[in-house]
């Protein structure tokens, strides 16, 4: 099995801290599929920012052509932006995926695009992307694995200045029960995370970050508990005294309701609430 991409290193801990929380928003997500082999997918989302009152939404239509290894996705959002993503998998080489990602804003007349490469090998994962512009920014990363140990590096090169804009290094170890991840960005930002699956229905994680010249280390703790098949409870707290709690209840196999809140123990006026509905009839 190929190692994860550089961006997905430490993903278990990241998901524990980020997924399942929607405080500050009212959200509705829907996913439906059509076709004999479910090769067409319609995904829509709408959100209302409680604080600013801003409404937003997007619609994605994905069509798969498995015999040619092609996936075509058309996107639209309420910012009046149109996107097209073409993925070609294992047609140019084993384990190689080539993606063309483009975005067009008709009201502004602006176009942008990227060509992405993802090469997955049994013990290595190499990714790269380059902007389709006159002076593109090039991102490249590689991850190598052996016996559960992972080491990775990433760099960003700005062709307009002919300089490295950013560099990152990462090191970690992953098992089905534990994931340890550490990283350094531009030799100034240091961080680490630990994820542990305590039981089949209990997960815990921690994150630690420190910046050269900063006031001290930032840290956070998170947990996820599923007392039943229909209910999942999440909680997290960080060094800024922010506490978040969320609960997801499966009203039916196709419909999930999520309630979440965040409050600051050091400030009485920083409370946030959120509600989300997720509909997926394929579940």
Curated annotation (Swiss-Prot):
Cell compartment(s), UniProt: Mitochondrion outer membrane
Organism, as annotated: Caenorhabditis elegans
Phenotype of null mutants: RNAi-mediated knockdown results in a hyper-connected mitochondrial network in body wall muscle cells.
Chief location of this protein within or outside the cell: mitochondrion
CDD domains linked: Porin3_VDAC
Transmembrane spans: none
Protein task: Forms a channel through the cell membrane that allows diffusion of small hydrophilic molecules. Plays a role in maintaining mitochondrial morphology.
Gene Ontology annotations of biological process type: mitochondrion organization; olfactory behavior
Similarity comment: family membership: Belongs to the eukaryotic mitochondrial porin family.
Origin organism lineage: Eukaryota, Metazoa, Ecdysozoa, Nematoda, Chromadorea
Domain notes: Consists mainly of membrane-spanning sided beta-sheets.
Name of the protein described by the UniProt record: Probable voltage-dependent anion-selective channel
Record's bilayer topology term: Multi-pass membrane protein
Entry GO MF terms: porin activity; voltage-gated monoatomic anion channel activity
Chloroplast is among the record's keywords: no
GO CC annotations on file: mitochondrial outer membrane; mitochondrion; pore complex
Keyword entries, A-Z: Ion transport, Membrane, Mitochondrion, Mitochondrion outer membrane, Porin, Transmembrane, Transmembrane beta strand, Transport
